[in-house]
Amino acid sequence: MTNVFHHVRNFIEQQPAPAKTLEKSSSPNILYTALPKHWRSNKSFQEPFYVVLLTPVPDNTEVSIWAGNDEKPCEEVRNEKAKVHRQVAKFNDLRFVGRSGRGRKFHLTIVIHSAPMMVATVKNVIKVTVDGPRDARIPKPQGSLKRQAEQQTIFPNDIIRTPGPPMPMTMIPPPWFPLPMTQTFPPSFFPLISPGPHPSISAALWKIHSESMKTPIKQKVEQENVSLNTSTCLSSPSIFITPTSDDRKLKRPSSPRSITKSSETSINLIQETPESVESKRRRNVSITSSNSSSPTIWRPF
């Protein structure tokens, strides 16, 4: 018995670090080296497969391996036989040719042909398929999605991950709040805002945001529209005849006095701005120049 433990100890010390892990079987006297969880059909393993015996067994005793499950009780295994040498049976090129099936694994049966015969079984040892272990056909990069979600957040990670009381509803900014920090914001704008419910802050921020988004072309167009609205019309003002209440009762045409009175009340005199005066002069000059060159053609500009 002392020789058995001596041989087993020497075997474990001589093996590299990955092969030192021995798995237990249904028999306490039979151990085996770990196998991969998933493997390809008819492919040799990277490391030899060992069966270690803790009971004294003479050398050159045959050890065989059987594989199967509920659907396939006995599948083909190549190089499934080995000889015992110093309590260790080494399988150099063990291959599982049969396939365990979809979602199923092989049960392993280790048989030591000694007197008496010893049998050990291990359930759900290895899964054998045609392709072997491979990546999914439609990968789901969960890590990249999480990174994109973190990048889309408006707050830094240290603020989000720190545990603390929930933020009150009055302090949560609207979705358009993260504006670019440009020259449109004066330096003294942010210190003026104190924490607390301010109903006029959102309107002020929206106004500042809309003004900051205006382009030079848009501002120029707005200025031109304002100048056109305030400029005076060169054509003669139209005279509106508004019948009085007496005329309506008598059903007679309105008098010339009412015509003059209505014309005075209907015409609104607009104060001329420097821009409107310049535009008026420009139009007058263009009219005179066009009359001097060709009196039949009128050129507004």
UniProtKB/Swiss-Prot annotation:
Keywords: Developmental protein, Nucleus, Phosphoprotein, Transcription, Transcription regulation, Ubl conjugation. Pfam families: Runt. The modification Phosphoserine is found at residue 255. The keyword Transcription applies. Residues 255-276 have a biased composition (Polar residues). GO terms for molecular function: ATP binding; DNA-binding transcription activator activity, RNA polymerase II-specific; DNA-binding transcription factor activity, RNA polymerase II-specific; RNA polymerase II cis-regulatory region sequence-specific DNA binding; sequence-specific DNA binding; SMAD binding. One of its GO terms (biological process) is negative regulation of gene expression. Expressed in the intestine. Residues 237-301 are annotated as: Disordered. Disruption phenotype: RNAi-mediated knockdown causes embryonic lethality and missing male-specific sense organs, known as rays. In hermaphrodites, RNAi-mediated knockdown causes a slight (5%) reduction in body length at adulthood. It is found in: Nucleus. One of its GO terms (cellular component) is nucleus. May be ubiquitinated in order to be targeted for proteasome-mediated degradation in intestinal cells. May be phosphorylated by members of the p38 MAP kinase pathway. Chloride binds at residues 99, 130. InterPro entries: AML1_Runt, p53-like_TF_DNA-bd_sf, p53/RUNT-type_TF_DNA-bd_sf, Runt_dom. Residues 285-301 have a biased composition (Low complexity). Residues 10-138 form the Runt domain. Interacts with CBFbeta homolog bro-1; acts to increase the affinity and specificity of interaction of rnt-1 with DNA. Interacts with TGF-beta pathway protein sma-4. This is Runt-related transcription factor rnt-1.
